[in-house]
């Protein structure tokens, strides 16, 4: 049986279930547990992008639209001239 699983190319069910659970937990925590989630996301995104590009922190806008079944995260970063 183990030999068949080796060649089947399918993931084992435990890692897939764990990944799905982590996604659900992250989504639930964002909906009810962290009032400053957008601020935290903005700061982390700003830190990552700032490693590669010098930019004005005031020109980074993060928005989250939450629907019943889907949440959307939008990030607008104004880059200096010559980089786009």
Curated annotation (Swiss-Prot):
| Family to which the UniProt record says this protein belongs | Belongs to the MinE family.
Q: Does the keyword Cell division apply?
A: yes
Tell me which species this is from.
Rhodopseudomonas palustris (strain BisA53)
Q: Which InterPro entries match?
A: MinE (IPR005527), MinE_sf (IPR036707)
- Primary role: Prevents the cell division inhibition by proteins MinC and MinD at internal division sites while permitting inhibition at polar sites. This ensures cell division at the proper site by restricting the formation of a division septum at the midpoint of the long axis of the cell.
Q: Which Gene3D superfamilies match?
A: Cell division topological specificity factor MinE (3.30.1070.10)
The domain of life for this entry's organism is: Bacteria
**Name used for this protein in its record:** Cell division topological specificity factor
Q: Name one GO biological process term.
A: cell division
Keyword terms of this UniProt record = Cell cycle, Cell division
């Amino acid at each position: 049986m183990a030999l068949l699983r080796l060649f089947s190319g399918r993931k084992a069910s435990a890692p897939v279930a764990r990944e799905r659970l982590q996604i659900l937990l992250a989504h639930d925590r964002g909906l009810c547990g962290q009032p400053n989630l957008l601020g935290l996301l903005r700061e982390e995104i700003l830190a990552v992008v700032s490693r590669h590009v010098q930019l004005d922190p005031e020109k980074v806008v993060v928005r989250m639209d939450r629907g019943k079944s889907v949440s959307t995260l939008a990030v607008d970063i104004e880059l200096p001239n010559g980089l786009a």
